[in-house]
Amino acid sequence: MPRGHKSKLRTCEKRQETNGQPQGLTGPQATAEKQEESHSSSSSSRACLGDCRRSSDASIPQESQGVSPTGSPDAVVSYSKSDVAANGQDEKSPSTSRDASVPQESQGASPTGSPDAGVSGSKYDVAANGQDEKSPSTSHDVSVPQESQGASPTGSPDAGVSGSKYDVAAEGEDEESVSASQKAIIFKRLSKDAVKKKACTLAQFLQKKFEKKESILKADMLKCVRREYKPYFPQILNRTSQHLVVAFGVELKEMDSSGESYTLVSKLGLPSEGILSGDNALPKSGLLMSLLVVIFMNGNCATEEEVWEFLGLLGIYDGILHSIYGDARKIITEDLVQDKYVVYRQVCNSDPPCYEFLWGPRAYAETTKMRVLRVLADSSNTSPGLYPHLYEDALIDEVERALRLRA
């Protein structure tokens, strides 16, 4: 209460005491007089207090006052009762807390400065503390998001338990799916490895058949790959054919529509009575194909260094015996030179002497540059048109051959 209002109240009380108190009375009369005076004083003070309150309400806005809106002890009592009622509602509602409902100014000293107001505030604090202890989902950290707290987002233990059960079930399903996928991958890998091994075995079997000039039958090939791999026979046969093309320059073809008998045909179109008829025929055919390709790629003339660099990409090295070709140097510098498929000569004015390879007359007669280009394109899964310079050279070679035949 402002000082001006207090002074007016005190002035009214003193005036009533001065006007209504007779002097010189003692004993029971004085006591009775005092009771009447106190009764009249209290009624007068209440009337005066009402006047002061009305004047203060008219002159001073409630927002600027630091006291209770009513400014009277009754108002303080009513304020404390409303707090207790609000506290009861807080206990029933677990979603509120004392920090969210009580302003900081109401904690501590009473707005009116009276002991009753202070007691009412302390009672509210005690009730609020009890409510906080009873409510498991509310605390003074109401502003903290649930994600930052360790509790479940729903605020109940059952929700956390159900979530953990779901996670365990999901993990079990994931493990089962992962194990199933791993088994499928392993089975597929084993199948590929088995097909690859059986293809190599079948290629060696066909090589021996060809060298012995024996007929190649499907029944014999099925016996070679065994009965348990019969479902994979088409894949094994396809991989075997690819292996024969890369290694020996020949492809596996059916002799009739029944598909029961096969034969090996040169990929370069070389006649069977030529290089494929002598000893060590397939290794020679394979190295000849690689040698003609590298010569054509290097402008129809390749140095010995360029040839060995290309053969090194195929795992064929100078001075090292190969598991399929044996002595590769002897084949390309002696055997194929004697058969006139390649020319091996010293580079002019080279010191120390260097050597180069060219196509021989028999290679020009039995194959064409276009066939060699197609072999190169097939090995890289492309088309001859992707090598424009080589393709142009091959077309010119085709035209010249046609003109020679007409002449």
UniProtKB/Swiss-Prot annotation:
Residues 195-394 form the MAGE domain. The keyword Lipid biosynthesis does not apply. InterPro entries: MAGE, MAGE_N, MAGE_WH1, MAGE_WH2, MHD_dom. The keyword Ion transport does not apply. GO terms for biological process: negative regulation of transcription by RNA polymerase II. Residues 1-175 are annotated as: Disordered. Keywords: Tumor antigen. This is Melanoma-associated antigen B6. The gene is MAGEB6.
